């Protein structure tokens, strides 16, 4: 079979991702485009004659970049297409918005690259009384047009057949430009590098005349002739860029008049009716908060019901199973405990997180695909404008509920570097799925019937602190106003099950692989440091271990937030959590249960793997039956409690160590707000600079320590009023000094707002050699 590389390109909300998932299924690989941290998705699929590599390009409305303030997505798409890596392009077009989508189509066809138009969302178009003549559209465009309903898989086989039959586009003159424009474009094309095809040279010439700033990187000497060409054109027309765009829109209007009845189209009545409520200025925000709470409640509820299968099952396989192998093969006791507690305990920490995190990703994917997330950004626009940000900056922040890494990377969709940078600084405060696992454990141990409310309050606190961080930046080192907010609101539709499953699986797989490696390694090292003293002797009591000795020295620093000296395990959890937040649960589980594991006698004769696995399945089934009972719906944390006996096990020890719900909640505040995990730090450094990464770390530590201290000292004021008053005043005074210093430093850091463009500039410079892909 021949190998074929295809670029998949289209407008945002055209169904491009759904089509990508339909074609490639689970055969996907996610990486980054060279030079920038924009996500690059590739997938594999086969047709009758070809083995296809499908590259999912970022959604974009056009290939023209008028300003360096523009989104990175347009630049990446343009660079890839001009690199020549794609043998064929599939342009996904939204049939219900044909006129707007055809602007990108015309630009692609003018390039002369073989192209197939995938006319998607025909079901939505039909509901709006839109009729499109497919054959007439294909004839006018000079390329195949394949009707699709990607959410239902309709038209996929026809698209694969068109891929096998692909050929050069018919030589149809689509756009009738003014003759002076063509003359100047041809004159620029003559001095461009000869290895660029003639059609692409003329296209680049038109792009330069239109004001595209990145086409000059490909034009060679032609860029030196641009000013003279524009001067000659201005003697004959007012604005060359306007004439070019107008010629394209006239062509699009002529095509639509012939092939469709868009003038008699009817808007979606359902979408219009729902938007009157969802976008209401008074109801919009409460509805958004309710949707977020419902998402959290269902994730905790259903995920908690599935937890026994992963928890009890992993204990049977990786803890008791390893112990059985160790005793059967006569391993030394220390080795058996080390493997069971380190390796087995690490795996047992990762797997129980899967149901709740998976449910969270599933519901996020549902909200994104259904069209609600765009409405959430619109609802939050007024609040974001107060921060000097456009409403669409809230979209990457919402993604942070799943993971902060794509939240940071999602800032690339914003137009201005200042807006990107502010959003990046706010993103780490959004409570990710890994933090949810920590909150659920603490809620079950300390808050009982109020567990759901406690966890929801932490989610809201994260949003509030992100907003306050934005306000702080706006009035200190990042003064400025938001760009006008224009955003397309897609019609509501029911997401395709296959697409939801694939998106959830891709996110969950990345989480498990990333978290699993770190948790297991950390658990093994913690077990080792728990087994030896500072002098190198083996210890029977973890309180005499090297880890305990070192941690006790550091723990007094956290006394103001309610971590007592004998609770050194909590200090270790904070340090390991800097690697990955999910490691906090693994660390506390390993340390709080260490003594119990060492003291327990394991009888290999009584071990029955089948019986333990059956117990896990039975417990899961019972939990699922009870999941939607009224009592569980009112208190979803109980469904995921996982350790019913509070006097024994990790949760019992944790309850004793913290001593009060106030101390536990203060600890959770610190976990929510302090240092981002390593992967988020790396994303911040790549998207902005190391300096801004350092600022994010220091600001997060300050906010976490300050807020946790204020909460705990106010909550425990009656126990030690003098100490509490000193701590409160010290925190307030320190933050006044910090804000004052940031205001004075404003003039020194403005230049750094361009940091997000450095990697793009290098990518653009490398594009002529084909390296920007």
Curated annotation (Swiss-Prot):
Residues bound to GTP 2: 35-39
UniProt membrane topology term: Multi-pass membrane protein
Family (UniProt): Belongs to the TRAFAC class TrmE-Era-EngA-EngB-Septin-like GTPase superfamily. FeoB GTPase (TC 9.A.8) family.
Region (NFeoB, GTPase protein domain, binds GTP but not ATP) residue spans: 1-274
Annotated PANTHER family: FE(2+) TRANSPORTER FEOB, FERROUS IRON TRANSPORT PROTEIN B
Amino acids binding GTP 1: 10-17
Compartments where located: Cell inner membrane
Gene3D superfamilies given in the database record: 1.10.287.1770, P-loop containing nucleotide triphosphate hydrolases (3.40.50.300)
Membrane side Cytoplasmic: residue ranges: 1-281, 330-343, 404-426, 474-517, 685-690, 743-773
Segments on the Periplasmic face: 303-308, 367-382, 448-452, 539-663, 712-721
One annotated GO molecular function: identical protein binding
Keywords for the protein's UniProt record, in alphabetical order: Cell inner membrane, Cell membrane, GTP-binding, Ion transport, Iron, Iron transport, Membrane, Nucleotide-binding, Transmembrane, Transmembrane helix, Transport
Its biological purpose: Transporter of a GTP-driven Fe(2+) uptake system, probably couples GTP-binding to channel opening and Fe(2+) uptake. A guanine nucleotide-binding protein (G proteins) in which the guanine nucleotide binding site alternates between an active, GTP-bound state and an inactive, GDP-bound state. This protein has fast intrinsic GDP release, mediated by the G5 loop (about residues 149-158). Presumably GTP hydrolysis leads to conformational changes and channel closing.
Ranges annotated as spanning the membrane: 282-302, 309-329, 344-366, 383-403, 427-447, 453-473, 518-538, 664-684, 691-711, 722-742
Gene Ontology BP, a term: DNA damage response
Keyword Cell inner membrane carried by entry: yes
Protein name listed in UniProt: Fe(2+) transporter FeoB
Stored Pfam families: FeoB_C, FeoB_Cyto, FeoB_N, Gate
Cellular component aspect of the GO annotation: plasma membrane
Protein species of origin: Escherichia coli (strain K12)
Residues bound to GTP 3: 56-59
CDD domains xref list: FeoB
Gene field: feoB
Domain FeoB-type G positions: 3-169
Binding residues annotated for GTP, in chain numbering: 120-123, 149-151
């Amino acid at each position: 079979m021949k190998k074929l590389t295809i670029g998949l390109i289209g407008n945002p909300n055209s169904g491009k991702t759904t089509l990508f998932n339909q074609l490639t299924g689970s055969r996907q690989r996610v990486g980054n485009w060279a030079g920038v941290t924009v996500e690059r998705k590739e997938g594999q699929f086969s047709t009758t004659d070809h083995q296809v590599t499908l590259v999912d390009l970022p959604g974009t409305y056009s290939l023209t970049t008028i300003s360096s303030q523009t989104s990175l997505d347009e630049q990446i798409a343009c660079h890839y297409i001009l690199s020549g890596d794609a043998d064929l392009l599939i342009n996904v077009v939204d049939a219900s918005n044909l006129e707007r989508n055809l602007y990108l189509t015309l630009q692609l066809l003018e390039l002369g690259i073989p192209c197939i138009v995938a006319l998607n969302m025909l079901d939505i178009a039909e509901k709006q009384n839109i009729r499109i003549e497919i054959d007439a559209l294909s004839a006018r465009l000079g390329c195949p047009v394949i009707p699709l309903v990607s959410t239902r898989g309709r038209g996929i086989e026809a698209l694969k057949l068109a891929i096998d039959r692909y050929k050069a586009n018919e030589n149809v003159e689509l756009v009738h430009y003014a003759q002076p424009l063509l003359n100047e474009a041809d004159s620029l094309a003559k001095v461009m590098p000869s290895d660029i095809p003639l059609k692409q040279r003329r296209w680049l010439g038109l792009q330069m005349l239109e004001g595209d700033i990145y086409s000059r990187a490909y034009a060679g000497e032609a860029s030196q002739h641009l000013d003279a060409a524009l001067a000659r054109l201005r003697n004959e027309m007012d604005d060359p860029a306007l004439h070019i765009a107008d010629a394209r829109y006239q062509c699009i209007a002529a095509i639509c008049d012939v092939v469709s009845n868009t003038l008699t189209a009817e808007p979606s009545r359902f979408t219009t009716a729902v938007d009157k409520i969802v976008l209401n200025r008074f109801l919009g925000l409460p509805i958004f908060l309710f949707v977020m709470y419902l998402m959290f409640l269902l994730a905790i509820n259903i995920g908690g019901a599935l937890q026994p299968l992963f928890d009890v099952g992993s204990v049977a396989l990786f803890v008791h199973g390893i112990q059985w192998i160790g005793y059967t093969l006569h391993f030394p006791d220390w080795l058996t405990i080390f493997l069971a507690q380190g390796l087995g305990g690490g795996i047992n920490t990762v797997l129980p997180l899967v149901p709740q995190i998976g449910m969270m990703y599933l519901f996020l994917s549902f909200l994104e695909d259904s069209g609600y997330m765009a409405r959430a950004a619109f609802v939050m626009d007024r609040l974001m404008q107060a921060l000097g940000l456009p409403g669409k900056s809230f979209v990457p922040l919402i993604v942070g509920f799943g993971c902060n890494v794509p939240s940071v990377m999602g800032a690339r969709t914003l137009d201005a570097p200042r807006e990107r940078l502010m959003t990046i600084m706010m993103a780490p405060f959004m409570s990710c799925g890994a933090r949810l696992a920590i909150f659920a454990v603490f809620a079950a141990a300390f808050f009982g019937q109020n567990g759901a409310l406690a966890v929801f309050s932490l989610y809201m606190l994260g949003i509030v602190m992100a907003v306050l961080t934005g306000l702080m930046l706006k009035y200190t080192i990042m003064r400025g106003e938001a760009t006008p907010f224009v955003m397309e609101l897609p019609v509501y539709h029911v997401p395709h099950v296959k697409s939801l499953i694939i998106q959830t699986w891709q996110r969950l797989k990345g989480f498990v692989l990333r978290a699993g490696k770190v948790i297991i390694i950390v658990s093994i090292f913690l077990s080792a440091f728990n087994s030896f003293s500072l002098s190198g002797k083996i210890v029977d009591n973890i309180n005499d271990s090297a880890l305990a000795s070192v941690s006790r020295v550091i723990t007094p620093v956290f006394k103001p937030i309610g971590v007592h000296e004998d609770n050194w395990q909590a200090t270790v959890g904070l340090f390991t959590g800097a690697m990955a937040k999910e490691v906090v649960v693994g660390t506390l589980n390993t340390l709080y249960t260490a003594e119990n594991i060492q003291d327990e006698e394991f009888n290999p004769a009584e071990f029955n793997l089948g019986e333990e696995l059956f117990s896990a399945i039975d417990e899961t089934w019972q939990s699922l039956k009870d999941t939607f009972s009224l009592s569980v719906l009112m208190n979803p944390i109980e469904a995921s409690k996982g350790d019913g006996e509070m006097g024994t096990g990790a949760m019992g020890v944790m309850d004793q160590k913290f001593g009060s719900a106030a101390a536990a909640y203060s600890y959770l505040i610190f976990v929510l707000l302090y240092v981002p995990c390593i992967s988020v730090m790396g994303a911040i450094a790549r998207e902005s600079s190391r300096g801004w990464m350092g600022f994010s770390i220091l600001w997060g530590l300050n906010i976490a320590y300050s807020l946790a201290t204020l909460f705990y000292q106010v909550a425990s004021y009656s126990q030690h009023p003098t100490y509490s008053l000193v701590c409160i005043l010290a925190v307030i005074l320190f933050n006044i000094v910090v804000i004052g210093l940031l205001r004075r430093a404003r003039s020194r850091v403005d230049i750094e707002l361009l940091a997000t463009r450095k990697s793009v500039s290098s990518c653009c410079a490398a594009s002529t050699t084909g390296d920007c892909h």
